[in-house]
């Protein structure tokens, strides 16, 4: 669920900005608090579980993975909220065509990264890590 919320925030924030869709941008801004709250709640559950039980290696690995991805997902949603907020500042009216393409490309890669991460997490797979690092480097190279 969090992965879907994060990818929705990224794609919605980007399209809000590029299409100058103030309603969509406002929805992303308003929804950010809900994502933050869900992330905080999940971290709290994980911390409680870690402190109150003897865990087998598989469950411990799962909980550590949650502690690793949740802050990253929350940060991505916060960045999407910031992008959406630029719509309300009328930034979309002055973005060049080249910049629009770059912003869309960065968003597309970020959405794909979170979709891949979500799929890998659900499957319990570690095989996505190299591809995710590569995609992250791709975004860095665009910036």
Which stretches of residues belong to each language-model region?
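Cytosolic, long alpha-helical scaffolding segments
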Residues: 1-143
């Amino acid at each position: 669920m969090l992965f879907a919320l994060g990818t929705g925030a990224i794609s919605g924030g980007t399209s809000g900005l590029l299409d100058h869709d103030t309603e969509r941008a406002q929805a992303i801004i308003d929804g950010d608090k809900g994502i933050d709250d869900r992330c905080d709640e999940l971290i709290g559950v994980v911390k409680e579980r870690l402190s109150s039980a003897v865990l087998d290696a598989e469950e411990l690995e799962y909980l550590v993975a949650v502690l690793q991805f949740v802050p990253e997902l929350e940060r991505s949603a916060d960045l999407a909220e910031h992008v959406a907020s630029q719509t309300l500042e009328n930034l979309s009216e002055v973005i060049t065509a080249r910049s629009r393409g770059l912003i869309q490309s960065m968003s597309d890669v970020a959405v794909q990264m979170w979709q891949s991460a979500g799929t890998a997490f659900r499957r319990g797979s570690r095989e996505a890590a190299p591809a995710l690092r590569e995609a992250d480097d791709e975004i860095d190279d665009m910036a």
